Amino acid sequence: MSSFCLSKHLILVPILVMMAQLLLIRNVLSLNMNNPYLYHKCSANQGEYKLGSLYKKSLDSGIQQLSKDNEVFRGGFVYMDHTDPNGTLRVYITFQCRGDIYGSHCRSCFATARAELFKRCPRDKAAIIWYDQCFLEFSSISTGGKINYDDNICIDTARARPNAKTHTGDDSVLEFLRLFENLTNIAVTKRNNFVKDVEKPALYAAGEKRFGNKKIYVMVQCTHDLTPRACVECVNHNVRQFQDCYEDKPVGLKKGARVLGRSCNFRFERYPFVNAKTSPNYLKF
């Protein structure tokens, strides 16, 4: 009887191990699907660091300090000016989660971005990487409070269908631009009720609006080191600069697009892509 129980347990152990492995793989795949890698840029302008150098030690120390700061992941943003032990060399680190992402999800995105950025830009003194839920940048030059247009990029997520009867023509583009203007104004005037003891505007807003018989979902966000005025300037510049990103002439508005940037970004799709329940300033127009 005891030998039968023992053999039964021996059979169950590998099955349980296999089930645990499958569950782990499923969770990893789910994370990658919900938070896909978008783009990265290794900056050659600031040169490279050597392994064991003061810059590398300062960078590692700053990243390690950031990873332990729970307030960063509660609030979803940090701009860090970190010096080496001698106080002679500075590293500037910027990290921000999408406006609806907080806590463990924000921390998870940071861990993913950190590992991947060091893999893709192993020796660069300056680099930036974007995921769907966050971005991470480090630099040897101060970037805080300044609008950076150099690292902007458009990602056209879908093409417009020429035979579509809705969402086409100049009227839809103009309506889309008015929607973005309204959303930006909300982002720079309304605070984030999900983050305590922060009185400044959220610099984030999202929402949805019906165009014809379908809906369009939109989001705009600026980094928290910008002033509200600088946020408006950044968004307006990118809307003008990347007109081809969201407009498919002469058809009209594309089905979806996003503009990534160090200082501000915006996105629109024909499907929901943010969590309305955790999004500050989520509106239905």
From Swiss-Prot:
It is found in: Secreted. The keyword Iron-sulfur does not apply. Pfam families: Stress-antifung. InterPro entries: CRR_secretory_protein, GNK2, GNK2_sf. Keywords: Repeat, Secreted, Signal. Residues 37-143, 161-273 form the Gnk2-homologous domain. CDD domains: Gnk2-like (cd23509). One of its GO terms (cellular component) is extracellular region. The keyword Repeat applies. Residues 1-30 form the signal peptide. Belongs to the cysteine-rich repeat secretory protein family. This is Putative cysteine-rich repeat secretory protein 14. It comes from Arabidopsis thaliana.
